[in-house]
């Protein structure tokens, strides 16, 4: 490949040569011309390599006189390899995803060789999706540019928290014309300037002896505090990076922490937690604070702007909040005062995180107000709510040598409080103000394939690693293709705004009419048999029958009557008398296209669950089963009961995570003890967030507990993000049968004999 030809700096011009060859060549020529022009005044000579990322059958082997990397060479960086890619060439969405992952690894290798000076590409919506994911994986500072037809729309999904630059193409990228010439030329020149500028700067200012860098979070209502903190930190010899706490801001800060760019944090404005808990538009996700604690860097935390939840224009505030105390910040931003009850939840979220810390943490709490609006005479002044937040944190946080809690008699924007924050930071931070700042390096193919070990929480996993790259070493081509087609259909539905609906079936007639109703997935497991025999679903978890044998028996009843819909098997992964690898092959040969972990120990809690984990019969065996099924190319749709389990399943390769809220509560034999519907929203969102941190493309469904009707499913789906549908079992076959038979008999009994 061209990356190995020279150790001199090199840029990649990347695109799909099968559809954008002329535009890619034109862009490459102007990048080279601009680099040569700028290089006349520079000691750097930068080479240009054209990289083809086409996903079609059409081959391109050269591009004018440029060094050229054909698509097959890029694809060789993916574990699927070129031959398997051919199977998916006609399935556009999956082909793009595979090529994007291959490009990510290709660029990682080039960056490891220390000669990658920048990347530039062009594309429509598909091309932008393909390129952006790979470009984002490169470290901050490496110039990365895409000329895109979607640069002027909603771009967060493309840019994330990276320094990727999108240039609007203005016209479609479809030939060279008077407009595209100007846009491509300007983008090429701008990119070349970025490349040469960075190379010259790196020569003059080495990054290996930089100042200790501190991340600081800010909102408009905490600006006086942050400005004072920043000014003092600079005097003390620190460099500061300030992040607007808008959801994206917190994620950007933690990404830089993970990358090694930030060595300490003053998390003054934690308002994103309020939006996450209550449902505002500037929310963090359930991983907030994790990167800081994992990297074990000094953390001083306060409660800035936890008196407010953010919404858009006043007309967009959800109906249930319309009677709350609202402050219109401007025409586009409305703020809602938080309540005593909500502040208790914020404290619980923060305390749960910080109590896990193994490094120095200091929490500073201002008694007289947490924002400019939380002061006497201001809209959000509420001493009861603010003092509740302080009391709860004092009560919940473990105050010890590792974690200090300081309650200070100031308002957050008082100069004395700002000084107290910095004093606390100096107490727990290293004495040196300079660091050997070496941001996280890119990974080789082997590194990436060995990433993401299953959580140590599950001892029965025995520390096994499961690749997140689509690694199917034990897959039959027909099984893998079936999985691919199913997932593509589901992704197509999601893109059209339609929910994914899965259903459990305990009888042939249930499965037959679930398919007739338009269901997307059907799962057979032993509880279906008990359920349709009038017993509770929990019977499937008790030693009343051989769970795996029941599923095989049900296959003969169900598979012949289901014509098109994917049918999966519920697998008891903790079965001590079955070799899982052989049993999965048996299920595959019978005709199942995928698996789910049921019966599951996730429905057990307390000492019994703990004993199962301790004696090697825990959730880890279910994770291991899903990983084995994934390697075989089977569709995997496991249940997860908490964020940690979702992470483990996502790392094992799960395609669809089903957020399980417990036994279904409705009907004559439903459970009576469960979380509330409102609590389910929070739990489902946390599981979805955890899943998407590991595998952004995973499908997430909600299931169980109080979610037992279309109305309740709609309630959850409308209040969550990244949740794509509902999976029902009792709600799909038991409840409809109970209601229909009861009503029908009642109608017959109401016949008049007179």
From Swiss-Prot:
Keyword ATP-binding: yes
Keywords linked to the UniProt accession: ATP-binding, Host-virus interaction, Nucleotide-binding, Plant defense
Any single biological process term in GO: modulation by host of viral RNA genome replication
InterPro entries according to UniProt: Aldolase_TIM, Pyrv/PenolPyrv_kinase-like_dom, TIM-br_IGPS-like, Tobamovirus_resist_UPF0261, UPF0261_C, UPF0261_N
Region of interest: N-terminal inhibitory domain NN: 1-201
Binding site for ATP: 18-20, 55, 92, 124-127
Region feature (N-terminal inhibitory domain NC): 211-431
MF-aspect GO terms: ATP binding; catalytic activity; protein homodimerization activity
Disruption phenotype: Increased sensitivity to tobamoviruses (ToMV,TMV).
Subunit structure: Homodimer.
Function description: Inhibitor of viral RNA replication which confers resistance to some tobamoviruses including tomato mosaic virus (ToMV) (e.g. isolate L), tobacco mosaic virus (TMV), tobacco mild green mosaic virus (TMGMV) and pepper mild mottle virus (PMMoV), but not to resistance-breaking isolates of ToMV (e.g. LT1, SL-1 and ToMV1-2) and tomato brown rugose fruit virus (ToBRFV). Prevents tobamoviruses RNA replication by affecting the association of tobamoviruses replication proteins (large and small subunits) with host membrane-associated proteins (e.g.
Family of this protein: Belongs to the UPF0261 family.
UniProt miscellaneous comment: Transgenic tobacco plants expressing Tm-1 exhibit resistance to tobacco mild green mosaic virus (TMGMV) and pepper mild mottle virus (PMMoV), tobamoviruses that cannot multiply in tomato. The Tm-1 allele present in the tomato mosaic virus (ToMV/TMV)-resistant tomato cv. Craigella isolate GCR237 (AC A7M6E7) confers resistance to ToMV but not the tm-1 allele present in the ToMV-susceptible tomato cv. Craigella isolate GCR26 (AC A7M6E8).
Entry protein name: ToMV resistance protein Tm-1(GCR237)
Organism annotation: Solanum lycopersicum (Tomato)
GN (gene name): Tm-1
